């Protein structure tokens, strides 16, 4: 069902088309090879909040049927800050991974193909009486107890921990999971899907991997960053070489894959992109920033989500890494992307977006669209195909993208959301309408928190924050009222 983004640390240092953007200089970014840990790890334990639709146990709020829909952020009672001590998490399409201070990996959500990395087959499931007055198709019983409740993956599943190495990043796609260790090793579990169903996990040898497994390809490389998509994942090594693994039917692996050779993609391999210092993935498209400060993208581009051209057409592909244009002197902080939209956050807190408009994915008001907005044959605005700065919004420090919604954290620690609203993943309450522009998430649970990390799945969202002192909370509230 869709994209996920790793949580990013907000505290880390035929149709009408208009004129083309002027040529600009390349952007810059923090050196991921030096500072990548800071992007994904909080310096202190977090309260964890979850919201949206959790019919596949995505919310991690326990097995009761009432937890299938949560319309505003809710504190996760199974991850108390002073006990669980969660410092990071990664959100997949229908599951979430979390990391605690001791490098234990927690998981919850859908485990149909082993994405949780632990056995949930003996869970108790209690179904409601289907003749009961309150029964319905949507709430016909409780959830799988072991999938809907956060739990640790057995520590012995990760041999590097016994050698003193720590987990420095987690990553989750729709159907698989990864853990990156401080020694550059990668452990993975789950599987990859393609248009026809399950593609497989590793070569033609493993179809589904239900427990963490050391990826042998990286025994001779030191991996420093992971970038998960829907059914693919990118890896960056310390020399700046990018590897790709998984489904490549939309060119997301950076190379053309012949149908008869598609199992060849089930082994991580480089595809010629080198001298890179930062990587990011959407569901079926990708980004990389080179060491000479060129931001490039590739993959599926039918709504301009790659941000490289005004040409928008159904099934369009960017077949090899192509450079994006951004305003002069932009320093990139992070990139998040969903199925058909992309978000680029600058170190100054400015947010640029490109991609689909139908569900307000880009967060740009329809009465202020740029002149290069793509319109269909009926004159309806459908996409913004080039990175465009969002105006009249706060300065942000962190951003995450789900399939068709996004969450961003302002520099004062308050979360904002926009996009597809029917699944309540925007966290704005009982309203099911799509949200046009970044809108403050207001609720009692998070009103006194400094939100640090955010992540988005297919139909849900997760955030992590630290409670402010009474004085700081009051000060922020006064500033917001001004």
Curated annotation (Swiss-Prot):
Residues 1-11 have a biased composition (Polar residues). GO terms for molecular function: guanyl-nucleotide exchange factor activity. Phosphorylated; possibly by KSP1. RCC1 repeats lie at residues 45-101, 103-152, 183-238, 239-291, 292-347, 349-411, 412-466. One of its GO terms (biological process) is ribosomal subunit export from nucleus. Residues 131-145 have a biased composition (Acidic residues). The keyword NADP does not apply. Changing residue 20 to T: Impairs correct nuclear localization. Residues 1-22, 128-158 are annotated as: Disordered. InterPro entries: Ran_GTPase-activating (IPR051553), RCC1/BLIP-II (IPR009091), Reg_chr_condens (IPR000408). This is Guanine nucleotide exchange factor SRM1. It comes from Saccharomyces cerevisiae (strain ATCC 204508 / S288c) (Baker's yeast). The lineage of its organism: Eukaryota, Fungi, Dikarya, Ascomycota, Saccharomycotina. The gene is SRM1.
């Amino acid at each position: 069902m869709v994209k996920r983004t790793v949580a990013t640390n907000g505290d880390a240092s035929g149709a009408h088309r208009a004129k083309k953007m002027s040529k600009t200089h390349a952007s810059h970014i923090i050196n991921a090879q030096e500072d990548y840990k800071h992007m994904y790890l909080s310096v202190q334990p977090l309260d964890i909040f979850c919201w949206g639709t959790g019919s596949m146990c995505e919310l991690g709020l326990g097995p009761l049927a009432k937890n299938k829909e949560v319309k505003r952020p809710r504190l996760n009672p199974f991850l108390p800050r002073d006990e669980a001590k969660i410092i990071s998490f990664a959100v997949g399409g229908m599951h979430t991974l979390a990391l605690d201070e001791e490098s234990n990996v927690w998981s919850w959500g859908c485990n149909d193909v082993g994405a949780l990395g632990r056995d949930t087959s003996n869970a108790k499931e209690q179904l409601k009486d289907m003749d009961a007055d309150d029964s319905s198709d949507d709430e016909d019983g409780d959830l799988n107890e072991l999938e809907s409740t956060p739990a640790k993956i057995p520590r012995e599943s990760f041999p590097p921990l016994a050698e003193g190495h720590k987990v420095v990043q987690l990553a989750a796609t729709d159907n698989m999971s990864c853990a990156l260790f401080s020694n550059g090793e990668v452990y993975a579990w789950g599987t990859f899907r393609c248009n026809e169903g399950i593609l497989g996990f590793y070569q033609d040898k493993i179809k589904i991997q239900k427990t963490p497994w050391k990826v042998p390809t990286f025994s001779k490389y030191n991996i420093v960053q992971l970038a998960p998509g829907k059914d693919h994942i990118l890896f960056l090594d310390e020399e700046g070489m990018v590897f790709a693994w998984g489904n490549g039917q939309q060119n997301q692996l950076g190379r053309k894959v012949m149908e008869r050779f598609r199992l060849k993609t089930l082994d991580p391999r480089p595809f010629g992109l080198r001298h890179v210092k930062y990587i990011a993935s959407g569901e079926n498209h990708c980004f990389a920033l080179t060491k000479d400060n060129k931001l490039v993208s590739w993959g599926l581009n039918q709504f301009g989500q790659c941000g490289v051209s005004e040409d928008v057409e159904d099934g369009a592909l960017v077949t090899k890494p192509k450079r994006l244009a951004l305003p002069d002197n932009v320093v990139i902080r992070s990139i998040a992307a969903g199925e058909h939209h992309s978000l680029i956050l600058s170190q100054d807190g400015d947010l640029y977006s490109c991609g689909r408009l139908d569900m307000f994915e880009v967060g740009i008001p329809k009465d202020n669209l740029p002149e290069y907005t793509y319109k269909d044959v009926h004159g309806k605005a459908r996409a913004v195909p080039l990175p465009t700065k969002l105006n009249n919004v706060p300065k942000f420090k962190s951003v995450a993208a789900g399939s068709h919604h996004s969450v961003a954290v302002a520099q004062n620690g308050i979360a904002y959301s926009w996009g597809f609203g029917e699944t309540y993943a925007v966290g704005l309450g009982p309203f099911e309408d799509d949200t046009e522009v970044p809108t403050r998430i207001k609720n009692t649970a998070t009103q006194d928190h400094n939100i640090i990390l955010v992540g988005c799945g297919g139909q849900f969202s997760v955030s992590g924050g630290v409670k402010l002192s009474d004085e700081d909370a009051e000060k922020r509230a006064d500033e917001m009222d001004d």
